[in-house]
Amino acid sequence: TISLKLSDLVSSLEVIKLDTASNALITGGKVILSENYLLLGPDWQGIYKLFGRKGNFLCDVGTYGRGPEEYMQIADAQLDEGNNRIYLLPYEARKLLVYNLQGKFVNSVPLAVFLTGCRMKVENDKVSLLTTPLNVPIVAYQQDMKGNLLDSVSARPYAVNRGMMGDINFSFNREFLSFHTGHWEEEETKQDSLYHYIPGKNRLTPKFTVNYEGMKTIPQHIYYEFGDYFRFDIYRVKTVHKETGIYSSRIQEKCILVDKKNRKAGIFKMKDDLLGEISWGNFSDGYYTENLGPAVLKAKLENLNKKEGLSGETRKRMDDLLNTIQENDNNYIVIGKMK
């Protein structure tokens, strides 16, 4: 068994209380960081909001709707503080929407290929995009800001069946984009890999896979990458038949960690010695983040405070924070910088 503590992965932990003004209130959702700003967006539909790094509300980003300068569902977003830009990529992506740090619409960038549910990166006047290889001709491509296609990767070698769903994620430091076919409620499983897409190379580079030789069937699985490790989770799908239909849920059976340096692997347990329960989906782009309502944060801190072995400094920090949390507070943003 391999054990890691959150403090092994992050060098610091910051808890930011958001402004409680009525127009600043948010639910949970995405957290995107820069040196002086927080860009917060809903999990699905809704408006993106810009805050200062101290939690002060600055502005809404654009407006919610179906108009040419508006949006409803956003698949991905990027905060570019140095160039006074915010990029929002709608779920049905025909154009990339560009706003300034005052939340005002600047322009839109036509996309060379119409795709849905993409992830994107804007850098040096170029846009790189990735999507799930499901009924699409291209899985990754790069273009300029005028919509001219610069390179692309065919989806054919990576295609998944309609019953499968893929997943795509950024690397921690946006040095590349990573892609893997994580499966959920699928009709069949298959041998697959975690890939890196390096824009301009016209290909995906495989970085990690698992040999399931000897097993009767390949199990449900998802691959992850963070820091010095690869991680893969094995699941079983539980199907329940009800009068209203057939429902499936995913149950984790094993979590296995692989050290990149020595390739040693073992059953993995994560110990959060800083804040409570870990949410793995929140490791991204060089940070560990949480977007928590006041009641949720208070419960996490109270549970952690009951544990033995906490340093006096850690316990005092938690007590001080607990004493400031009020029921009617806006959300709290937790930020841990990856080592």
List where the protein language model places each region.
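A short helix->beta-strand "capping" segment at the edge of beta-propeller domains
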Residues: I2-T27
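Blade-loop segments of beta-propeller domains
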Residues: D19-G28, I47, N56-N83, P90
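Repeated scaffold domains used in trafficking and secretory/extracellular systems
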Residues: T27-K30, Y71-A77, F114-V122, V160-N169, ...
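Short beta-strand elements that form the blades of beta-propeller/WD-repeat-like
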Residues: S34-D43, N84-P90, D125-P133, N173-E188, ...
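Asp-box/WD-like beta-propeller blade repeats and closely related beta-sheet repeat scaffolds
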Residues: Q73-I74, L89-I138, L149-G163
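Beta-propeller blade signature
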Residues: V139-K146, K190-Y197, I246-K261, D329-K337
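Conserved blade-ending motifs and adjacent loop-strand segments that build the rim/top face
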Residues: T205-I222, K254-G286
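Blade-level signature of beta-propeller repeat domains, shared across WD40, Kelch, NHL, RCC1
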Residues: D285-K339
